[in-house]
Amino acid sequence: MLIVVPITLIVLGPISTELSDVVGSVIQAFFNSASIIAMPVCSAIYPYLVMLGIDKAIMPIGAAGLASMGYDLVYLPMGYISNLAVGGSALAVAMHLKDKGRKGMIASFGVTALCGVTEPAFYGSLIMRPRVLIGTAIGAVAGGLIGGIFPLKNYVLGGCPGFLSLLFFLPPDGSMGNMVVALVSGIVAVVVAFIACTVILKKSYKEDV
């Protein structure tokens, strides 16, 4: 403890801060120059930003967008699509398993991810099956394309984006167009990730019971 704590505070803390600043700047520049492409790409890499603990570097971008334009095109939309792709992937893993105990546990992880909390699904079912993460990325890209082509906006800044935070995408005027984009992009992310992961599991993890 006498060694680890000072190293964490003095060395790793500043490095993490600098890395977060760089990631935030790169993502902001990417969205400014090519938002249609940026949404699917960033949705696909978002789980790894969460894993590294630097996903919060994107939150100031969302806050700035809300303050200046009244909506956010970056932080919550990419997290929403990514989280749903992770949820769909975990449900595919659960369907693939034969052991009822593990099946039920991982299915609950998938439902939790669909609600916006992905850590149980990511660490409890996906990360030990690296090829399945390809299916997760495919689902995120598919949903992200819709969210990029029909710019998905959120009007409330919050955490843990998922189906439970759909009202974050409701405009102040009550129009439903953006909500439809949120629903369609989210459902596409779940379904495509589920199908892609199911195919990968059948081909690569036949021994997984």
Where are the model-predicted features located?
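Core mid-bundle transmembrane helix pairs that form the ion/substrate translocation pathway
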Residues: 1-50
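Transmembrane alpha-helical segments and their short flanking loops
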Residues: 36, 100, 108, 120-209
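Membrane-interfacial loop-to-helix junctions in multi-pass transporters
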Residues: 27-41, 52, 69-76, 98, ...
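Alpha-helical membrane-inserting segments
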Residues: 3, 7-12, 49, 88, ...
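Membrane-interfacial segments
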Residues: 11, 15, 19, 23, ...
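Helix-loop-helix junctions within the multi-pass membrane cores of secondary transporters/permeases
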Residues: 62-140
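Transmembrane alpha-helical segments in integral membrane proteins
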Residues: 51-52, 57-64, 87-94, 187-204
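Transmembrane alpha-helix interface/packing and boundary motifs in multi-pass membrane proteins
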Residues: 8, 43-55, 66-71, 112-115, ...
